[in-house]
Regions:
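Patatin-like phospholipase
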Residues: 1-42, 50-171
């Protein structure tokens, strides 16, 4: 059986478990990147899905995850805590951009690459899912190059992983 579609769930720190499971499955030939046609993801899964779209080298990903000086990126200042009520989150889209910048540069992609441009380069449909909190009812929004072709990859990932109070919502 050939796996053509990956579905990556959210779950915050569970994203590390998901990463390990995907790596194990790939290394044991349960799936091959060459056969992947689409990635459907939410929250932490969208971050991992973004990594997989930009590099398919597990050693590069391992080195990045383990050796990046995360303390320099994740700096929670007293100002961020005090502005939490107004901004509704400690981190914003700039953090997501900083996380993905090395991979975008290594692929020679613009850091503002759109979902349509990414599809044209990878030929993989990338779907991020988010919830619209501004509607009368909570509605799930599917984000892909089919529905939002001009949306930047980092913005789509940020929208999907906008955990309340951690990341500022994107309207």
């Amino acid at each position: 059986m050939t796996i053509k579609h990956l579905v990556l769930s959210g779950g915050g720190a569970g994203g590390f478990t998901l990463y390990g499971a995907l790596k194990h499955m790939h290394n044991n030939e349960f799936f091959s990147f060459e056969n992947i046609e689409s990635i459907h993801a939410s929250s932490a899964g969208s971050i991992i899905g973004g990594f997989l779209l930009l590099t398919q080298n597990w050693n590069d990903l391992d080195n990045y995850i383990l050796k990046r000086p995360w303390d320099k990126l994740i700096n929670i200042s007293p100002t961020a805590i005090l502005s939490l009520w107004q901004k509704k989150g400690i981190f914003d889209i700039e953090m997501i951009k900083e996380i993905f910048k090395p991979f975008l540069k290594s692929m020679d992609y613009n850091e503002n690459i759109t979902l349509k441009q990414l599809f044209q380069k990878t030929n993989i449909d990338f779907y991020c899912y988010t919830t619209n909190l501004n509607s009368d009812i909570l509605e799930t929004v599917s984000i892909s190059y089919h529905t939002h072709p001009d949306l930047e990859l980092c913005k789509a990932i940020c929208m999907s992983s906008a955990f309340p109070m951690m990341f500022e919502p994107i309207c």
